[in-house]
């Protein structure tokens, strides 16, 4: 399939629609309420932080 400007815009909107971001944030908050307060310098949490950062950047990058 070819990528037109319209489909590209639609893709970006789907990627970071406020409703979806809110849902993801709620789920993440519920699951990692305890984890969040601790600093991410520890090896165990480093991977988690990276994953979160990547997800947040998703629209700006593309």
UniProtKB/Swiss-Prot annotation:
PTM field: Proteolytic processing into mature chains is required for histone eviction during spermatogenesis. Transition proteins (TNP1 and TNP2) are required for processing.
Listed as disulfide-bonded, the cysteine pairs are none
Asked whether the UniProt record includes Oxidoreductase among its keywords, one would answer no
Q: Where in the cell is it found?
A: Nucleus; Chromosome
> Its Gene Ontology biological processes?
cell differentiation; chromosome condensation; spermatogenesis
Q: Which UniProt keywords apply?
A: Chromosome, Developmental protein, Differentiation, DNA condensation, DNA-binding, Nucleosome core, Nucleus, Spermatogenesis
Q: What GO cellular-component annotations does this UniProt entry give?
A: nucleosome; nucleus
Instruction: Give one GO molecular function term.
Output: DNA binding
Q: What does this protein do?
A: Protamines substitute for histones in the chromatin of sperm during the haploid phase of spermatogenesis. They compact sperm DNA into a highly condensed, stable and inactive complex.
Q: So what family is this one in? A: Belongs to the protamine P2 family.
Protein name per Swiss-Prot or TrEMBL: Sperm histone P2a
Species whose genome carries this gene? Equus caballus (Horse)
